[in-house]
Amino acid sequence: MRVTQGTFCYLPDLTDEQIRKQIQYAINQGWAVSVEYTDDPHPRNSYWEMWGLPLFDVKDPATIMFEVQECRKQFPNHYIKVLAFNSTKGIESTALSFIVNRPANEPGFVLRRIESNDRVQRYQIHSYATEKPEGSRY
């Protein structure tokens, strides 16, 4: 099952040239770009590990692409995404986020039905990948 998080998630994986162009777009908007990674693909896991520091004031997409490549070398079987943060007063939020690396095998999720008080049915999703300990999921 393909994890669909962020912009372009329903499109085929971006090439390095397409990634570079998106990074250039973010730089042109004045956004700070960063790289993050995780081995926990749960949709509510919004706190991924940060690769280095956010790349504030970087004007060359090659610098950020270098960081993406280094992160891919270190974590070839993790999800890696590029984030662009808009620090404009009143916005101060992620403006662009897309996955640039994913594991070769994405095991998917199981949907569990849980009966709660007064026979209320609740649903929970659980990633098959998280059944293994952190660092050995893929």
Curated annotation (Swiss-Prot):
Which Pfam families does the record associate with it?
A: RuBisCO_small
Where does the record say this protein resides?
Answer: Plastid, Chloroplast
Gene Ontology molecular function: any one: ribulose-bisphosphate carboxylase activity
- Report the InterPro entries cross-referenced here: RuBisCO_ssu, RuBisCO_ssu_dom, RuBisCO_ssu_sf
Name the keywords, alphabetized. Calvin cycle, Carbon dioxide fixation, Chloroplast, Photorespiration, Photosynthesis, Plastid
**Chief location bin:** plastid
Q: Which SUPFAM superfamilies does the record associate with it?
A: RuBisCO, small subunit
Task: Tell me which Gene Ontology terms the entry assigns under biological process.
Answer: reductive pentose-phosphate cycle
* UniProt entry tagged with the keyword Plastid: yes
Entry GO terms, CC: chloroplast
Which SMART domains does the UniProt record give?
RuBisCO_small
Keyword rRNA processing listed? The answer is: no
HAMAP family from the xrefs? RuBisCO_S_bact
Its family?
A: Belongs to the RuBisCO small chain family.
**Miscellaneous notes:** In this alga, in contrast to plants, the small subunit is encoded in the chloroplast. The basic functional RuBisCO is composed of a large chain homodimer in a 'head-to-tail' conformation. In form I RuBisCO this homodimer is arranged in a barrel-like tetramer with the small subunits forming a tetrameric 'cap' on each end of the 'barrel'.
| Biological function | RuBisCO catalyzes two reactions: the carboxylation of D-ribulose 1,5-bisphosphate, the primary event in carbon dioxide fixation, as well as the oxidative fragmentation of the pentose substrate in the photorespiration process. Both reactions occur simultaneously and in competition at the same active site. Although the small subunit is not catalytic it is essential for maximal activity.
SUBUNIT field: Heterohexadecamer of 8 large and 8 small subunits.
Q: What is this protein called?
A: Ribulose bisphosphate carboxylase small subunit
